[in-house]
Amino acid sequence: MTFRQYIELLKPRIALMIALTAITGYGAVATKVDPVALLLLTLAMILGSAASAVFNHVWDRDIDRLMRRTSRRPMATGAGTPALGFALAVVLMVAGMALANAAFNWVVALHLFLGGFVYVAIYTVWLKRRHWTNIIIGGAAGSFAVLAGAAAVDQTQWLLPMVLALVLFLWTPSHFWSLAILLADDYRQAGVPMLPVVVGAKRTAWCILANTVILVGASLLPWGLGLLGNVYGFVAAVSGAVLLGFNVVLVRDTSRRWAGWNFAASMPYLLLLFIAVFADKHW
């Protein structure tokens, strides 16, 4: 395998997103930001996320070969062996948990493990090929990253981290179902029961809209409960309204174009919420 293929195995963009999620959990409860702690937390989360990604590559190599988007992945092409992948995944997870425990505490390490367990065992192995609820349950993997970040600072302040974890949990279906509409033919070809394959694009678009309504409501809870201030509340309300606008258009037009726009819009929405948490707490 080439160096580039090893990097692809790690799914670095997802790893970075998980790290940013943990940093947000850290920032939500910290009274001041320790750059060294943030660096160590980032590294631990990247290691844990990368471990889950490698396992996903190994387990899904058969269906990856059937989908245009994933057919060139290293495990799908045979560039890497399952034994190599499993070994790398174990090493990365052990390293991530060891770092989390040494730099912070066992609670951070536990949440790191639980996030990986949900993604690997519950989503990848159990639900992905069996039921359309796969991505709903799998969304809990990101929620554990928020809790890990919070536990790195204080293991007693749980209300705000739990609400933010709920936001992450609700964000995942709205984000991923848009992608699933875009890639419905791929999933159908591979026999993966993503929601658009099961109920069609139109009903999926309605599900996205309904889910986002709940998501935006949940995102306003930190402001409504007085856990965060007006800066966060304003950002959550405006960005939520914009995302809902994209969802409404998707309900009217379920073309690949608007599915792609909805998928793309969900990313800056979450990033803006992350920034707003930090802005409200530390700036």
From Swiss-Prot:
GO molecular function: protoheme IX farnesyltransferase activity
GO biological process, one term: heme O biosynthetic process
Class in the EC hierarchy, top level: transferase
Matches recorded under Pfam families: UbiA
Topology in membrane: Multi-pass membrane protein
Record-annotated membrane-spanning stretches: 14-34, 35-55, 84-104, 107-127, 133-153, 163-183, 208-228, 231-251, 258-278
Compartments where found: Cell inner membrane
Reaction it catalyzes: heme b + (2E,6E)-farnesyl diphosphate + H2O = Fe(II)-heme o + diphosphate
Note: Carbon 2 of the heme B porphyrin ring is defined according to the Fischer nomenclature.
HAMAP family, A to Z: CyoE_CtaB
Biological role stated in the UniProt entry: Converts heme B (protoheme IX) to heme O by substitution of the vinyl group on carbon 2 of heme B porphyrin ring with a hydroxyethyl farnesyl side group.
UniProt name for this protein: Protoheme IX farnesyltransferase 1
Species this chain originates from: Paramagnetospirillum magneticum (strain ATCC 700264 / AMB-1) (Magnetospirillum magneticum)
GN (gene name): ctaB1
